[in-house]
């Protein structure tokens, strides 16, 4: 241990010319000995604005202890987070996906400016995970991601409840299915404390994907936020990073095409969020791996859906943790030949080596099925194409009895207009809702539609109405819904010229998304289509519109 591990920070601390730099560092606690140790950046997404992140400062301190114990000198710094749950359903959601880019940019800026020899990033809410990983890819110093952990379920009248319970209660209350008293009780009990939303929603999906990628320690993905195990996970991550520096292992050696195939497989088996498609493509682009919708389609067709997890199933992430966690699932998949066991990880060992001594899934548990008893023989994330989405779209079919619908289009130019129509009973069984100008540029920010989809479920329309959009869906969404339609309406995609009453089809069994009008009619309408003006003229969203790429490219803003 010593100066030979300071491959980056030596330019900040070494030599007579760096005396002013060292003077500044002494003021924040550095000693003479510290200048001979590797400098470690700890990127914390702590914030008081969301339960997903409210505990992360304590976790960052545990990481700091581990780094110190292993011979490094740690520096905690902050980056932003927003709360998808709190922003949902209003103008604030425009800022959600752009926050991913700001997280990535800010971590890249700080750790490259300080010349950190290694970086540990700690994330909680949805956009933290991909934002942190994108930054670690750009920096490409030895790095580890630590997940803040999943929330414990709430309890209302003896039943487990969570964030989706209260979103769906809005529709139920409006439809007269529950009393105001029950409505209020659900609100008061849905979120009991710290941690990320508890089903296989976006945060838990991405934590699982990151463990499968090899960028977090085995077992990290499914641990509850409030637990001694999570605190120890953080401590061990701090120690493990010094091992990575000693071995010279960086994200570029870990994040290979096969690693991304592992992540996709785990997401599909668990019934993960559609957002994983967007985020994994974005992370892959940052590290220089070619990953496309076709890869998701190829893997989905041969990967069964095995885990009975919310939103389409019964169980929460804490339930999965009790029967073996994500690493238990991965061990089963490796035995079944469904994972690449030779992929390197942040332990310095391969996936197969990590899993060798990990426990199997608990016998006779009912959360994760065997391949022979799969919930569905193929993956629940389905890539659709057709004359409505020439470049592709993404659907999720887990928990659905119907996976196709043909019906008249009900067209809305924004999520807000659609939500009002649902709440005033203007949507009927058999309708196919079109919400457009909600894409990366058109929204801007590709808003999530949990308020809309939950209102449909609460109204009893979840199985009888289709919904398609160039926006996104929350990991908590379930129903016959299609998002990420590309090209988006703002760019003149065919979704821009659909008219009320056009017959449209969502057919997940055929990977088809189409409007039943002739190509000549589509071309005619597109010729008369006029682009809309950007909704924001100044500020971060105006800048975002100028930089953001399509959903099929991960909605990245990096100039790759």
UniProtKB/Swiss-Prot annotation:
Keyword terms of this UniProt record: 2Fe-2S, Amino-acid biosynthesis, Branched-chain amino acid biosynthesis, Iron, Iron-sulfur, Lyase, Magnesium, Metal-binding
Enzyme superclass (EC): lyase
Cofactors demanded by this protein: [2Fe-2S] cluster; Mg(2+)
Modified residues (N6-carboxylysine): 127
Region described as Disordered: spans on this chain: 1-20
Signal peptide: none
Keyword Iron: yes
Catalyses which reaction(s): (2R)-2,3-dihydroxy-3-methylbutanoate = 3-methyl-2-oxobutanoate + H2O; (2R,3R)-2,3-dihydroxy-3-methylpentanoate = (S)-3-methyl-2-oxopentanoate + H2O
EC number per UniProt: 4.2.1.9
Pathway assigned in UniProt: Amino-acid biosynthesis; L-isoleucine biosynthesis; L-isoleucine from 2-oxobutanoate: step 3/4; Amino-acid biosynthesis; L-valine biosynthesis; L-valine from pyruvate: step 3/4
BP GO terms, sorted: isoleucine biosynthetic process; L-valine biosynthetic process
Single Gene Ontology MF annotation: magnesium ion binding
Residues where Mg(2+) binds: 84, 126-127, 448
Pfam families linked to this entry: ILV_EDD_C (PF24877), ILVD_EDD_N (PF00920)
Chain positions recorded as [2Fe-2S] cluster binding sites: 52, 125, 197
Cofactor notes: Binds 1 [2Fe-2S] cluster per subunit. This cluster acts as a Lewis acid cofactor.
Keyword Magnesium applies: yes
Function comment: Functions in the biosynthesis of branched-chain amino acids. Catalyzes the dehydration of (2R,3R)-2,3-dihydroxy-3-methylpentanoate (2,3-dihydroxy-3-methylvalerate) into 2-oxo-3-methylpentanoate (2-oxo-3-methylvalerate) and of (2R)-2,3-dihydroxy-3-methylbutanoate (2,3-dihydroxyisovalerate) into 2-oxo-3-methylbutanoate (2-oxoisovalerate), the penultimate precursor to L-isoleucine and L-valine, respectively.
HAMAP family per record: IlvD
Subunit structure: Homodimer.
Family indicated by similarity: Belongs to the IlvD/Edd family.
Name listed for the protein in its UniProt record: Dihydroxy-acid dehydratase
Encoding gene, per UniProt annotation: ilvD
